[in-house]
Every structure is written in C-alpha cells, then in structure tokens.
A protein has these predicted regions:
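An N-terminal, well-structured beta->alpha segment
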Residues: 7, 11-113, 203-232, 243
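Gly/Ser/Thr-enriched, mixed-charge loops and adjacent short helices
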Residues: 17, 21, 25, 41-45, ...
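Conserved phosphate/anionic-ligand binding catalytic regions in large, soluble enzymes, centered on
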Residues: 46-66, 153-156, 235, 239-251, ...
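N-terminal small/polar loop signature for handling phosphorylated ligands or for N-terminal nucleophile
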Residues: 97-160, 258-314
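Active-site phosphate-binding/coordination module
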Residues: 135-191, 307, 405
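Glycine-rich phosphate-binding loop plus the immediately following alpha-helix
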Residues: 166-194, 329-353, 357-367, 420, ...
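Phosphate-binding and adjacent anionic-ligand microenvironments
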Residues: 295, 299-301, 322-324, 342-470
C-alpha cells in the first residue's frame, strides 16, 4: 500500500514535466518512464528533489527532479543569482566565474549557468574549456568576483555530475550564506528560471588566467636547487581523462622537471572514463595503467589527479622495489613534513606560520608540528573548513600548508580549495629531495615513522544509492 501511494505521488510530480515549460527531449524521457510498467526508474527520478546542500548539487544525470539536468542546474543557478543580487545590490557590477570538468554535460551545464547569471544582470567569466577546480577558486579571487561555480562531480562514477558553489574568497560557501542560498534555490520554480542569456555580460577566459595561476604555483617551490640537481627525476602522471591533463604537466615542466611521462590513453578528455572502472585516485585500479608504465621505464613516482584535478593519488617503490600506493594520510604527512622541515632548513619559516588538517586526518601531523614548534589547527571534515581557518587568520598569520586524508592538499593561500596542480609539483619536489639524499619517498615515510611514531589506517566506503536501497 505504501508503495502504491509513492507511485501515485511520483506520477503526479512527473506529469508536471510534460508541460511546455520543459523541452521535448525531457518530456519524451519522462513519458517513457510513466509508460513503463516497472516504476523503479520513475520512483528514483522523482521521489524527491535533488537537494541543493551546503556544497551545492551532486547526482546522477537524467530527467527528473532527483537528477542532474538543465532544470535542476538552472534552479540552483537562478537561486544563487537571486541571492547575489540581494547580497551585493549596492556593490556595483556583480561578477562570477563559471568552470567545468570533463564530465558528460559539464560544458552544457556551464553554458546554461552562464546564460542564467547574465540574464540576471551578473557578469560571467566563463572558462573556454575544462579547468581544474583550484583554478576556478583562484580566478574568483584574481578577478575580484563575488561568487563562482564549477560543474563537476569530482571522482564519482561517470553517471554523475555536480555543481560546486564558491564565495568571494574562492572557498566553498559557508554560513550564513550557505543556508540563505539554499532558501533561495528552494523558492525557484521552472517558470522563474531565466534561460535567455545576455551575451554582452559573458566573457570567455582561459590562457590568460592559466599563465598567472601557474606563475603563482611555481613560486611555491621551496628548494629549486634540488630540482636542478634532480631534473631527470622520472615521473609518471595521469589525469584520468580529466581537467589536470594540460596544467599539471605544464606546472611540472615550469618547476624544472624534464622527464615527465603521461599515460597517453588517459590524456584523452572523456566523461566516459573508458580506461577505468571509477576515476578515483584513491583506488589501485585507477592507477594501474600508470603503474604499468612506471614499471616499464623504472620511474621514481606515479601521480594521478581526479577529473576536476583537486585531489591527487600517489604511488612509489617500497624497500623491496615493489610499487605501493601511498594513502591520503601518508601523502598529507609527507607533504606537510617536507614543507615544515625545509622551510626551517632554508630559513623561510616564520613564527606566524601555521598548518591545518581535518580532525579525521592522521595525528602524526600534529606530532611533526609540535616537535618543530609550528602551530597546527584541527578543523571539521571538508576543505571549506580549512579555507575558513585561512580566512580567519588573514593579515595576522601565514598559512603554509594543509590537507585531509581524502587526498586533498593545499600549499598556498591564493587558492581556497584543494589543489592537485600545486600538490603534484610539490610532491615531485619531495621525491627529488629524497633522491638527492639517495632515498625514495618510501624511505622518507619510514624515517618519519621512526622519528614521530607509526600509525596505520584504512577506509571503508559504504554506497547506498536511491530510495529503494535505503
């Protein structure tokens, strides 16, 4: 009986999607679901509205209120535009950055969002093609925008897409703006969405921002001399078909690394991710092609970025010469250990310097910070909280690095989200520093364990998609 009531509710909701407010393709898809005797798909697509949460939208693509499509994306953008026009009504021309990753429909959603923002009188800086999430964050700050969005579902399977919303500091939206935007989005009906854009308010950006961003990333190198000595460090990199495919190799080259090998099959931009089960750099399977290449050429390090190039996975050889994955906690530990030790060694460390980690990230980082008399701040899970700590201390202290166990790291304050572009370059420098001492990254990790203690951890993912699996 309960199931019959649910079918009745979703049928009534779906029938509203057969009106002229929706395009013919969408109407045909909804009609097909309504006529199908098996109502499972209809239920999944309409049993709720895709929720615009504090991080934006994320969901499976398709027709329906519980799917990522031009109408759910349109409502999110219209709601954000309404809030921006309220919040900054006395600030002159409001502007936003719009970016996207390699996923199917990401460009379409980005262009539709640009049209909606411009139709609401908001100037749009639209990236010409896919770009890393951290570059979107950088562009918001660099161009003095009030907000920005990136169309991406990070490392989720190919069926998904998503919508990340950012505020004027380049960080994901926090209170009080997050709940206020949600309220605005929830008020929007399909008739409210202004799909007809104002092309005069849309400006295409690309290489101009790339150049400034890469110059800033290059300035993060702590020990350029060690790179000069180890410029032939053998690096294997894969973007997993995503947004890191141009800027990460370019950054490595700019830092001085001359022996970078990209996995050719995975340098191809594709939202279908044809060479992997899931484009998640945490998974061994996603790095398998890169590791095979590394074995052939006897590489020193393997790195993989996810589709929007904000997270990085890494592998290196252990003490037996076998390739092993370095998990997020270990990578974050290596990352911050190197920054601290070498800033001290090069005389760059200042009393006001601080690092940040999330509460679920290894406590060995605190041990390193304490022994070296560096302030370490714990924050809630999620990189927006690391960004919050940076913002709270602006003008008083200097952020020098942070990260989380979920493979997100940030060495700079000119970006306010995790950054695989700078992380890959700095991790390569760490590998060069190790090799300069006749060591591997694995050896450095063992040295840290000897000096600061040992810890071991594992992550268990539980996936329960849809109404009927709850």
């Amino acid at each position: 009986m309960e199931n019959q009531e649910l079918i009745k509710q979703v049928t009534e909701k779906a029938e509203k999607w057969l009106t002229p407010a929706y395009d013919a393709e969408t109407q045909a898809e909804v009609k097909r679901m309504l006529e199908n005797p098996d109502k499972t798909e209809l239920i999944e697509c309409f049993y709720k509205d895709l929720e615009f949460g504090t991080g934006g939208l994320r969901g499976i693509m398709g027709a329906g209120s519980n799917r990522m499509n031009i109408y759910t994306v349109g409502a999110a953008t219209q709601g954000l535009a309404n809030y921006l026009n309220k919040c900054f009504k006395d600030k002159g021309q409001i502007s936003v950055v719009v970016g996207h990753d390699c996923r199917n429909n990401s460009r379409k959603f980005a262009e539709i969002s640009a049209d909606i923002f411009s139709a609401n009188g908001i100037k749009v800086y639209l990236f010409e093609d896919l770009r890393p999430t951290p570059e979107v964050s950088f562009a918001i700050r660099h161009l003095g925008c009030q907000s920005g969005i990136n169309l991406t579902a990070s490392h989720n399977p190919k069926e998904y897409n998503g919508y990340k919303a950012y505020w004027d500091d380049g960080a994901q939206v926090l209170a009080p703006h997050d709940t206020a935007i949600i309220d605005e989005v929830n008020k929007v009906t399909v008739e409210d969405i202004k799909f007809k854009g104002n092309k005069d308010l849309i400006q295409i950006i690309g290489e101009d921002i790339d150049e400034v961003y890469l110059d800033k990333v290059h300035a993060l190198s702590i020990d350029p001399e060690v790179i000069k000595r180890q410029k032939d460090l053998s690096i294997v990199y894969t973007p997993l078909h995503g947004a890191g495919r141009v800027l990460i190799p370019a950054s490595l080259k700019e830092w001085g690394f001359e022996n970078v090998h990209c996995v050719p099959e995975q340098m191809v931009k594709s939202g279908d991710f044809p060479t992997v089960v899931s484009p998640n750099p945490e998974n061994a399977e996603a790095l398998s092609m890169a590791i095979e290449l590394a074995k052939k050429i006897d590489a020193d390090i393997v790195m993989a970025s996810d589709p929007d190039a904000d997270r990085v996975g890494m592998a290196c050889k252990d003490d037996k010469g076998e390739w092993v994955l370095i998990n997020g906690n270990q990578t974050c530990l290596l990352f911050l250990y190197y920054i601290i030790k070498n800033r001290i060694a090069t005389g760059k460390m200042q009393p006001t310097d601080f690092i940040v980690k999330t509460i679920v990230t290894t406590e060995l980082i605190k041990a390193v910070a304490d022994k070296n008399k560096i302030e370490m701040i714990d924050c809630y899970t999620g990189f927006k909280w690391i960004a919050r700590e940076i913002r709270l201390r602006e003008g008083k202290q200097q952020y020098i690095g942070g990260g989380e166990e979920s493979y997100g790291f940030l060495a700079e304050d000119f970006v306010r989200d995790k950054d695989a572009v700078s992380a890959c370059s700095l991790l390569a420098e760490i590998c060069a520093w190790a090799k300069d001492q006749g060591k591997t990254l694995y050896d450095i990790l063992m040295d840290i364990y000897v000096e600061y203690g040992f810890s071991k951890e594992t992550t268990v993912n539980v996936v329960k998609p849809g109404k009927l699996s709850l």
